[in-house]
Each structure stands twice: as structure tokens, then as C-alpha cells.
């Protein structure tokens, strides 16, 4: 997180340089400075051209091609989601520790980038650093049902759903600065069977562990669907206790 920035100056610059918007109008209508000024809760994605400029001058080595900031409930504080740790296996504790070390180095470089290149962030100061890495995906349990990209809209999926997701299929490359972002055609359901391990009794799954493929997980991994899946697992557990 950072403080001591001038968001209005940043948005003025963004308004004058539309090439620095990472999400285009034909993808998200109304994704513009007017929206950002009116919304206390937003996620800005862009500054592609400024990052290209910084890379050309040797000032940006983070494997990202876009700057992302997210507003927080704390006035005057922004969360920066622009680091990326690649080419590690996050299921290996040693590699995870090395990734955390790399993350700290990236924070230093990102602060220097913001101070030097981003209008409105010339005097920005570091407010906090996450104590852990945000790991998108490692292992999944094998459930009694596995939801895949091919079956996410199947009739039986809708009938058996205990939660839904409407977020994009948002796959971040683990080896380079690339994101595959594909809108979902419509909200899709997550069947109860994806929460039930195939070979373990007395356990229900939630969050990153559910039985889905990478494409489905790229949508279902975000907060809204995870909250819904967690509630479904808790409800099922309570019903199981009630029924003995």
C-alpha cells in the first residue's frame, strides 16, 4: 500500500493519455476517469506506455506490462497490485521463500517507478507490504465432481450449483508478463460435488482447493465466488451435523 499520492493529478494524466488505459472501452463501458472520480471503490489498470518507457530506460524489470492500483477502505491509501513472481513452484516451501525475497525487491523498484514516472505519485510513500505472497494456484483436490471449461455451462452444472461466479477467466502467466483475460458468457455455477473430496470423509473443500480446472479456477478464485463457496461448505457442514 502507498500514501501521499495525488489521485486527481494521476486521473488528469490518464484522461489526457487514453493509450495508458489497459482495459479498452469495448470491453468495459464507462471504464474512464469520470468513473474513477465518482467511485470510492475502483481498480485502475493501465499505464502500459509509461511502463514500456521505463523498461526501455532500464528502470522497470518487474514482469508486468500494466500498473494496477486498488482503492482501500482507508482514506488516502491505495493498494498496488503490480508485482509478479514467476518461475517458482509455490507448493515448494523453499521456492516460496525465494519468491517472497524477490517480492521485496520488486516493491523497491515499483516505488522508484511510481516516484519517477507516474504523475501524482512523485511523493508517494510506502505504507505497508504484505507479509506473504498471494499464490493464485497450486494443487487441487480430486472431488466427486470436477468442473471444467467445457462443462461450466452444462445443464447439470446449473442444477447442482451451490455458488456462482461471473468474474472473467483471468489467467496470469507463470513464466512471463502476460495475462489472458476472457469475459465469461454468463454467470456459471459451482456444483456441490466440487467441494467434496473423492477419497476423504468428514471434509469439505473451499477456496483454492476445490475440484475445478485451471480455466474455471481463473474465474472462481476471486473473493466473491470464494465467499459463496465458503458459505455453501459451512451450510453443508451444519446440515450434516443436524442430520447426524
Task: Give the label of every model feature segment.
Residues 1-244:
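Flavin (FAD/FMN)-binding glycine-rich loop and adjacent Rossmann-like elements that form
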Amino acid at each position: 500500500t502507498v500514501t501521499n499520492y495525488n489521485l486527481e493529478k494521476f486521473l488528469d494524466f490518464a484522461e489526457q493519455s487514453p493509450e495508458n488505459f489497459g482495459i479498452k472501452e469495448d470491453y468495459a463501458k464507462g471504464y474512464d476517469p469520470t468513473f474513477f472520480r465518482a467511485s470510492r471503490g475502483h481498480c485502475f489498470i493501465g499505464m502500459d506506455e509509461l511502463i514500456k518507457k521505463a523498461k526501455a530506460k532500464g528502470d522497470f524489470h518487474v514482469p508486468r506490462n500494466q500498473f494496477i492500483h486498488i482503492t482501500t477502505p482507508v482514506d488516502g491509501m491505495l493498494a498496488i497490485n503490480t508485482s509478479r513472481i514467476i518461475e517458482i513452484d509455490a507448493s515448494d516451501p523453499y521456492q516460496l521463500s525465494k519468491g517472497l525475497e524477490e517480492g521485496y525487491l520488486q516493491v523497491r523498484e515499483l516505488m522508484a517507478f511510481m516516484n519517477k514516472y507516474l504523475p501524482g505519485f512523485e511523493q508517494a510513500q510506502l505504507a505497508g507490504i504484505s507479509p506473504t505472497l498471494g499464490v493464485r494456484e497450486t494443487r487441487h483436490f480430486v472431488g466427486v465432481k470436477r468442473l471444467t471449461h467445457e462443462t461450466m455451462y452444462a445443464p447439470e452444472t446449473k442444477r447442482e450449483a451451490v455458488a456462482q461466479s461471473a468474474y472473467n477467466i483471468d489467467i496470469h502467466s507463470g513464466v512471463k508478463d502476460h495475462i489472458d483475460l476472457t469475459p465469461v458468457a454468463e454467470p456459471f455455477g459451482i456444483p456441490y460435488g466440487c467441494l467434496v473430496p473423492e477419497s476423504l470423509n468428514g471434509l469439505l473443500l473451499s477456496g483454492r482447493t476445490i475440484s475445478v480446472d485451471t480455466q474455471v479456477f481463473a474465474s472462481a478464485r476471486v473473493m466473491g465466488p470464494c465467499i459463496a463457496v465458503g458459505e455453501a461448505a459451512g451450510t453443508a457442514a451444519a446440515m450434516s451435523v443436524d442430520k447426524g
